[in-house]
Design a protein with these regions (language model features):
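Membrane-embedded beta-strand positions in outer-membrane beta-barrel channels/transporters
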Residues: 29, 80-82, 125, 145, ...
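Extracytoplasmic beta-strand/coil segments of soluble accessory domains associated
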Residues: 65-106
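Short acidic/polar hinge/loop motifs at secondary-structure boundaries
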Residues: 70, 98-99, 104-130
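Non-catalytic regulatory/gating segments with a bias toward low-complexity or hydrophobic composition
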Residues: 48, 56, 67-68, 126-131, ...
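A beta-strand signature from Gram-negative outer-membrane beta-barrel systems
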Residues: 108, 120-160
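Soluble periplasmic/extracytoplasmic beta-strand elements of cell-envelope proteins
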Residues: 29-33, 47-52, 82-84, 98-102, ...
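Transmembrane beta-barrel wall of Gram-negative outer-membrane proteins
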Residues: 158-160, 165-196, 200, 204-242
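N-terminal Sec signal peptide and the immediately downstream disordered periplasmic leader
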Residues: 1-59, 65-72, 178
């Protein structure tokens, strides 16, 4: 059955900046931190694929399955990732991943959780490093590493609300509010609510199969002065799904 999807987006920004220069048509430079320092992707001596926020939006990347279509030599399953054939052998106790996953530089024990957090909404950049990365990333990175870099709070007053509706009662709502609190302190709140009715009818008293409900709330706080920057990020997520 054809799936119908409608997208409504509302963006509220305190100011708009327009460039007087026309688009030169050149290739946009992507800055990555794969080598623990900021550098152009063209100057990075690692086999890497990177998605900045504009590319994530243009390709409509919302989950790990979407990512797999654009990453060479990579296989992604619901909770695991393999690069060049190297991944997790088994998920039982002691089954360490072969590809390390990081969110803002912090190690994540589960790729599935990190890659579905916020539906890749409000993500600044995604970096996929292919090949052994033990020198910079330590254990569990013999196959490669994946970095998710989220957007940080800033001194810009801005907000956005975005909704998507479709068949089977599918509805998704995304939104954020970024606001300065003082000259040195700012906060960013992100809310994502996604859900869909089941696609397989349950003839009993239970819910239809393959339905899901996902609620995700994030608070990001940044304090900075001329010499130091401190970022604090907290996340609360509730996810439920009726498996078929």
């Amino acid at each position: 059955m054809k799936k119908l999807t409608y997208i409504i987006s509302l963006s509220l920004v305190s100011f708009f900046a327009f460039s007087d220069d026309e688009d030169s048509g050149g290739i946009e430079e992507v800055i990555v931190t794969a080598e623990r320092q900021a550098s152009s992707i063209q100057d990075t001596a690692i086999s890497i694929t990177a998605f900045d926020e504009n590319l994530i939006e243009d390709l409509n990347l919302r989950n790990q399955e979407d990512l797999q279509n654009y990453i060479p030599a990579t296989t992604i399953q619901p909770y695991d990732i393999s690069i060049r054939g190297i991944g997790r052998m088994f998920r039982a106790l002691g089954g360490d991943p072969g590809v390390g996953t990081y969110v803002d530089g912090a190690y994540s024990v589960d790729f599935g959780i990190a890659s579905t957090d916020n539906g890749l909404y409000d993500v600044e950049r995604i970096e996929i490093l292919r090949g052994p990365q033990g020198t910079l990333y330590g254990r569990n990175s013999i196959g490669g590493a994946v970095n998710f870099i989220t957007k940080k709070a800033s001194q810009v007053q801005e907000a956005e609300i975005r909704t998507i509706v479709g068949s089977y009662g599918m509805s998704e709502a995304y939104g954020f509010l970024n606001t300065p609190l003082t000259d040195n302190l700012s906060a960013r709140v992100i809310a994502v609510n996604r859900g869909r009715d089941g696609t397989i009818k349950d003839l009993g008293a239970g819910d239809d199969l393959d339905s899901y409900q996902d609620e995700n709330y994030t608070l990001s706080i940044r304090w900075e002065n001329d010499n130091h920057t401190l970022d604090i990020r907290g996340n609360e997520r509730s996810y439920g799904r009726v498996l078929s």
